[in-house]
Amino acid sequence: MSMMYFNIFMAFTVSLVGLLMYRSHLMSSLLCLEGMMLSLFVMMSVTILNNHFTLASMAPIILLVFAACEAALGLSLLVMVSNTYGTDYVQNLNLLQC
């Protein structure tokens, strides 16, 4: 495994550990999810470029679109929770059940 792949994998791992450790605030969880998606995007782009696999050249863009949709939904949920309860704690999300 080259050093570049190792660094990208470590970025994903650090974001995953951050997501598992700092779960109290919704904003920190969203930032860790965005870090994971960004590292997946970079890993996918580098792999496709190194292997000259032109058939999958659209896959990183699709992943980026899904990451943008996830960020928009997460931020709208953050605004709704903070307006309703005054805080952005993840434990308030259990109160949103129907």
Curated annotation (Swiss-Prot):
The entry's keywords: Electron transport, Membrane, Mitochondrion, Mitochondrion inner membrane, NAD, Respiratory chain, Translocase, Transmembrane, Transmembrane helix, Transport, Ubiquinone
Catalytic activity field: a ubiquinone + NADH + 5 H(+)(in) = a ubiquinol + NAD(+) + 4 H(+)(out)
Keyword flag Translocase: yes
One of the Pfam families matching this protein, by short name: Oxidored_q2
GO-annotated molecular function: NADH dehydrogenase (ubiquinone) activity
GO CC terms of this entry: mitochondrial inner membrane; respiratory chain complex I
EC numbers for this chain: 7.1.1.2
Transmembrane segments: 1-21, 29-49, 61-81
Coiled coil: none
UniProt main location, coarse: mitochondrion
Membrane topology note: Multi-pass membrane protein
InterPro entries, per database record: NADH_UbQ_OxRdtase_chain4L/K, NUOK/Mnh_C1-like
Biological process, per Gene Ontology: ATP synthesis coupled electron transport
Subcellular location: Mitochondrion inner membrane
Record carries keyword Transmembrane: yes
Family per similarity comment: Belongs to the complex I subunit 4L family.
Assembly mode: Core subunit of respiratory chain NADH dehydrogenase (Complex I) which is composed of 45 different subunits.
Protein task: Core subunit of the mitochondrial membrane respiratory chain NADH dehydrogenase (Complex I) which catalyzes electron transfer from NADH through the respiratory chain, using ubiquinone as an electron acceptor. Part of the enzyme membrane arm which is embedded in the lipid bilayer and involved in proton translocation.
Descriptive protein name: NADH-ubiquinone oxidoreductase chain 4L
